[in-house]
Amino acid sequence: MIKMKNKLISLMLLPLLVVGCSNGQKSYVLNESTFFLVMTNIQYYPEEYVNKDITYDCFTYNIKDVNNKEYLCGVRKCTAGFGCRCGKDTVIGFILNYEGDIPEPKNQYEDTNDKAWIHLVGQLASETKTKIEINSYDANGNISDQTEIVEFLSFNVSSLETITDYSNLAYFVSK
């Protein structure tokens, strides 16, 4: 009976411990095994990550809206990421805010690891997402007469390093 009572008390205290630990965490380091899940969690619960340091490796990617405004992002490619309703591959990451030079995207539409890779440290600018209206594509990869809205959080970059040896990084991430 005492063992059962101790287990019950432990189970009741576990959520408090988890909440207490996660609220006090000041930084997140996304790596190959955590990138997709943590990035997805950030997209759903951005308020939990504002003012927390986030470190991650990504490649640069331009998103152009229907008015030809460009957004330079730091992303990874994934299947059915946050906000994806099409069931096709998409990208997950942030719009980058940085005072210095950011490498131009390289092979962003190609299924290759040969990209413009960067190592970033920074924080979410806010929990507000930027809505970007983009052209939709048909099954053949041609621009259709439809548009769709994608949403990205903005990331204030405090440190950026170019990654020259990206052999241990995967442009495509999943669960």
Residue ranges, per PLM feature:
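Positively charged n-region of N-terminal signal peptides that target proteins for export
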Residues: 1-7
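Sec-dependent N-terminal signal peptides of Gram-positive bacterial secreted proteins and lipoproteins
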Residues: 7-22
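OB-fold and OB-like single-stranded nucleic-acid-recognition modules
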Residues: 21-175
